[in-house]
Design a protein with these regions (language model features):
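Terminal targeting signals and extreme-terminal segments of soluble enzymes
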Residues: 1-133
């Protein structure tokens, strides 16, 4: 599943930024993102959008890995982030955990860290999609 997720995102935004999924299980996903010039803001610090993309990618892949029987996909309907710190080098990591896995919605929390310190908290709600009859 890890290989599939990394291949799935390779030509899209996660791959463009360099996001690597390293662990996937039902209700939990872990990923990392190398901090480099392409993910920085003009002020020299990590761009908030890079952090949000990492967290949203973790939560989204977690949702896909945990879809209820009969569901075909999902769409994000709400997201929120709190940025508590930043990074200028190294690697940032994200762990997303399911808070609610219902038939019509899922809620996921993600924590983004740098060198063991939490730099962002993220929550998103996803609507579970089913094929049209």
């Amino acid at each position: 599943m890890i290989t599939d997720f990394n291949a799935r995102g390779a030509a899209c935004l996660p791959g463009h930024l360099g996001i690597e999924i390293v662990e996937v299980e039902k209700g939990r996903v872990h990923a990392r993102l190398p901090v480099r010039q392409q993910v920085m803001a003009p002020n020299g610090y990590l761009h908030a959008g890079s952090v949000v993309t990492l967290a949203d990618t973790c939560c989204g892949y977690g949702c896909i890995a945990s879809l209820p029987e009969g569901a075909s996909n999902f769409t994000t309907v709400e997201l929120k982030s709190n940025h508590l710190g930043t990074a200028r080098d190294g690697v940032i990591e994200c762990t997303a955990v399911a808070v609610h896995m219902g038939r019509t919605t899922q809620v996921w929390d993600a924590t983004v860290s740098h060198n063991g310190k939490t730099i962002a908290l993220f929550r998103c709600t996803q609507m579970v999609l089913y094929p049209k009859a």
